[in-house]
UniProtKB/Swiss-Prot annotation:
Alphabetical keyword list: PQQ biosynthesis, Transport
Described purpose of this protein according to its UniProt entry: May be involved in the transport of PQQ or its precursor to the periplasm.
Organism: Pseudomonas savastanoi pv. phaseolicola (strain 1448A / Race 6)
Lineage: Bacteria, Pseudomonadati, Pseudomonadota, Gammaproteobacteria, Pseudomonadales
Family: Belongs to the PqqB family.
Originating gene: pqqB
Name used for this protein in its record: Coenzyme PQQ synthesis protein B
Length: 303
């Protein structure tokens, strides 16, 4: 299985366009040793030719341009994208579909709850019908697994995650299973397994069992501290309120990951305020000590 990190930052990217926190300002003036990052998205393939896009970031055009296999050049109009999986209906994970309209129709896999949001509160399915048929919905059921025909050797097993629907959703304050999912993806030839959950607010025993079954854990790296937005002076909400488990502190992501010594551990969906973006920070050194990696745009993993 080929895993390509197209974007590794949380919403707004890094540096965020309107932010002057210590990280963003430091990156711009050159005092911070860090890499710029676009908004979270990955691509999966079983042959390096046909790719499944997991979430469609607002930065999708730049991400595709930066990854040569996404333009195989087999015809006058071509793309390496064979299918799209949406893990939720958040704006940061779906607005890229608008930039892919020239390539419609697209095969899109998502849950019923995500499809409902994208047909009502943010009606991308309706809007894109006007471009060569738009988006063809393939329902993700929360029980069992599914295979995408273009990548027949990859088996996708979805699982619900505790999280709120987007602010625009008609059921914003009435959460349902399927608002947000993670994926366990297995290459049935090699046996390699990826656990992918960029929005992970809590790890219970059922999730821990899936994590133990994986070779690589690509998980939520949004915030170092739960009150990070408040500490940095850029917001009032905590990580938990936004559905993200912070790395630091009792019960935090680093403590959780200590329970998986045999797995490769990679943090993704990193907020612009997170000190781990500073490659010289003590927080980054702590990740190195714990053998936890930080995803970056262009990172490649094979399982």
């Amino acid at each position: 299985m080929y895993i390509q990190i197209l974007g590794s930052a949380a919403g707004g990217g890094f540096p965020q366009w309107n932010c002057n926190c210590v990280n963003c300002a430091g990156f711009r003036d050159g005092s911070l040793r860090a890499q710029a990052r676009t908004q979270s998205s990955i691509a999966l393939s079983d042959d390096g030719i046909n790719w499944v896009l997991c979430n469609a970031s607002p930065d999708i055009r730049a991400q595709l341009q930066g990854f040569a296999p996404m333009q195989p050049g087999r015809a006058l109009r071509d793309t390496g994208i064979s299918a799209i999986v949406l893990m939720d209906s958040q704006i940061d994970h779906t607005t890229g579909l608008l930039s892919l309209r020239e390539g419609c129709p697209h095969q899109v896999w998502c849950t019923e709850m995500v499809h409902e949001d994208l047909s009502t509160g943010f009606p991308l399915f309706e809007m894109l019908k006007h471009w060569n048929g738009g988006l063809t919905w393939n329902r993700i059921e929360l029980q069992g697994s599914f295979v995408i025909p273009a990548c027949p050797n990859l088996r996708f097993t979805p699982f619900p995650l505790r999280s709120a629907a987007p602010p625009y959703s008609p059921h914003r304050f009435d959460p349902h299973p399927g608002d947000n999912i993670g994926l366990l993806v297995e290459d049935t030839r090699t046996g390699g397994k990826l656990f992918y959950a960029p929005g992970l607010g809590k790890v219970d025993e059922a999730l821990a069992e899936k994590m133990r079954d994986a070779d690589c854990l690509l998980v939520d790296g949004t915030m170092w501290d739960d009150d990070e937005m408040q500490r940095r002076g850029v917001g009032t909400r905590t990580g938990r309120e936004m559905g993200h488990l912070a790395q630091n502190g009792p019960g935090g992501m680093l403590e959780v990951l200590e329970g998986f010594p045999e797995q490769r551990k990679v943090l993704i969906h990193i907020n612009n305020t997170n000190p781990i973006l500073d490659e010289d920070s003590p927080e980054r050194a702590e990740l190195v000590r714990r053998n936890v990696e930080v995803a970056f745009d262009g990172m490649s993993i094979e399982l």
